[in-house]
């Protein structure tokens, strides 16, 4: 018996079926990523979701290590330039040097990139912000303050970055929402299915 002839439409349907099948394990649901204990503790104390705190830290201080994006505690942002240090001591020296040459409102430090100028009342010594536990406690506190009961946490996340809101807050929300989807193990895209729907007769 002769094999059935292949037509462009049958090839297209076959490719779409393969694409959909390949996308099901990862395109529909991702494995949930449980935030490390320090994030869970800080979030619990502040009364906020630990996934929200972890997603913010991934956005603020995330670096690639061993193929994974992880928050880095000894991170600074000085006048828009990210700086990473190998140790807390090195980061503290870098912070002190930056403070001598840069307005404090243009310096962010630690896991949650706490601003030295706008949040000066939240710490005693600037290098305290390089203590991961202290930094997370402050970040969680700020998120809690920016959240209105009953609203989506993404709105509070936007105000964490820019309390006045606007487009900078919206851009930040979009970036953090991708990290949040990864942490929560939720679907991030339906592109393969949509693409096949467009081509189906």
PLM region descriptions:
Residues 1-4, 199-201:
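Short, intrinsically disordered, low-complexity terminal/loop segments
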Residues 3-16:
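Bacterial N-terminal signal peptides that target proteins for export
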Residues 14-25:
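Bacterial N-terminal signal peptides
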Residues 27-31:
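Sec/Tat signal peptide C-region and signal peptidase I cleavage site
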Residues 32-201:
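Catalytic glycan-binding domains that act on GlcNAc-containing polysaccharides
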């Amino acid at each position: 018996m002769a094999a059935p002839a292949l037509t462009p439409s049958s090839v297209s349907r076959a490719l779409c079926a393969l694409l959909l099948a390949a996308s099901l394990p990862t395109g529909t649901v991702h494995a949930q990523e449980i935030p490390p204990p320090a994030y869970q503790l800080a979030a619990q104390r502040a009364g906020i979701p630990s996934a929200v705190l972890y997603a913010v830290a991934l956005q603020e201080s995330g670096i690639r290590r061993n193929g994974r994006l992880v928050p880095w505690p000894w991170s600074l942002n000085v006048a828009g330039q990210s700086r990473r240090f190998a140790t807390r001591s090195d980061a503290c020296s870098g912070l002190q040097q930056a403070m001598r040459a840069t307005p404090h409102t243009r310096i962010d430090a630690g896991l949650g990139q706490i601003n030295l100028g706008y949040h000066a009342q939240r710490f005693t010594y600037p290098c305290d912000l390089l203590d991961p536990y202290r930094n997370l406690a402050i970040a969680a506190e700020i998120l809690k303050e920016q959240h209105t009961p009953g609203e989506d946490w993404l709105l509070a996340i936007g105000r964490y970055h820019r309390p006045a809101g606007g487009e900078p807050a919206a851009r930040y929300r979009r970036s953090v929402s991708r990290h949040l989807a990864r942490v929560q193990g939720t679907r991030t895209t339906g592109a393969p299915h949509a693409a096949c729907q467009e081509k189906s007769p």
